Amino acid sequence: MKIHKCSFCGAEIPPGYGIMYVRNDGTIQRYCSRKCFVSATKYGRNPRKLAWVRKRQK
């Protein structure tokens, strides 16, 4: 089993968890939670500007 990384926050996603989102161009994006999924797709937020994201620049 492969452990994937969240496309938004960079957290590790264990097998059987998370959301796999396939865009129209065929790219696969994986999200650890609905919070990450909605922030990326619906609101178009930049993960580097959010305090709760692990990928954030310090």
UniProtKB/Swiss-Prot annotation:
One of its GO terms (cellular component) is ribonucleoprotein complex. Pfam families: Ribosomal_L24e (PF01246). A zinc finger (C4-type) spans 6-36. One of its GO terms (biological process) is translation. Its cofactor is Zn(2+). Zn(2+) binds at residues 6, 9, 32, 36. Binds 1 zinc ion per subunit. HAMAP family: Ribosomal_eL24. Part of the 50S ribosomal subunit. Forms a cluster with proteins L3 and L14. This is Large ribosomal subunit protein eL24. It comes from Pyrobaculum neutrophilum (strain DSM 2338 / JCM 9278 / NBRC 100436 / V24Sta). The lineage of its organism: Archaea, Thermoproteota, Thermoprotei, Thermoproteales, Thermoproteaceae.
